[in-house]
Amino acid sequence: MLLIYKNMPLGAVISSHTSIVPVLDRMGIGLGVGEATVEEVCINKGVDVDFLLSILNTFLNEGYFPEKSFQRASKEDVLSYLKSTYEYYLTSQIPVIEAHMSHLELGESTPLHMLKRMVGNLKSAISSAMENDSKMDFDASDEYCQTAISLIDDVKSLIIKLISGSYNKNMCYALLFFLSSFHKDLSHHLRIRYRVLIPMMK
């Protein structure tokens, strides 16, 4: 298990684990970190370093459970992270899916209409998860997150099984790869909720 520690240069960590870039962004940390350590960047950005390490290590390691000493973040920090995660999905991920769909060159086919309806349902599920988390109704939010993951699987399945004939193959493949990445991110988000965020709220 490869863990991130506060004395590690954050730039080197990002270079080894580029998948954490969106997670860092949700915490208010962008690129351009220079040679600063994880702790130095957190101090500069006003981020709780232990909270960040809990999030990142849980994101990267399926078998990781945060140390009790890490579970000190405020309720405001947790709710802010949850909100920024959903906003990232709604303002970054979903629009990318919609943009890919618009370039599939499917015309006004039945599969395209089905895809649009599924993506609309995906957007609604994520919006509902965000709303319920803001009310601290975490069980309801978990259900909406699971629904979102199932919808991503449904979109992938529809593309694989129903799209045929003349279409933009490169864009279709890119969409499948992107959906797989989105599925992985959402699954990691659920793991972080169970192991880090919700325990901090109790």
Label each region the model flagged:
Residues 1-202:
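Small-residue-biased structural context
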